[in-house]
Amino acid sequence: DQLAALHAVPTDLEALAKLGRPERFVERQIERWLGVRREHAVRDLPELFSLGEWLQRNVPVASAPAVIHGDYHLDNTLASKEHPEILAIIDWELATVGDCYMDVALMLMFWGDYRTQEPPAFSALQAVSRRAAVVSRRELAGRWAESLGRPLNHMNFYICLLYTSDAADDMFR
């Protein structure tokens, strides 16, 4: 609910005028991460550039700009001990005005689901979300989409882009 509320903040507020450049946001992210890879590769991953080309050819039509956190997942929130609710979102240094689907994709990427087998890469981040009483990724994304009246048509693209950016940055060396 907090992420949907963030994405509903009007982007035409004067205070947000210098926060970001929403034009070609996704395209710039692809270019940025491929550039990082070209300049700072630690190991050879030639498939990454093929994937980058595919991403460039398949960028979804831009969504309406939104205020985005840039690193939204449970580890960047403060939760209530008494109730299942998020009290605050922290770690704002990547906040900008851009494509809100990037935030949703990152949240889903780090969200565990006890119903499925997960790769071990994010097991520590998924410790809370993998519990049996916690909503699934599908339910979580559906709740966000319903709150904002936005479709979830291209989530696989955005999740692919985020895994690509992680690989480009050699996050999992």
Model-flagged regions — what are they?
Residues 72-73, 164:
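Metal-dependent nucleic-acid phosphoesterase active-site entry motif
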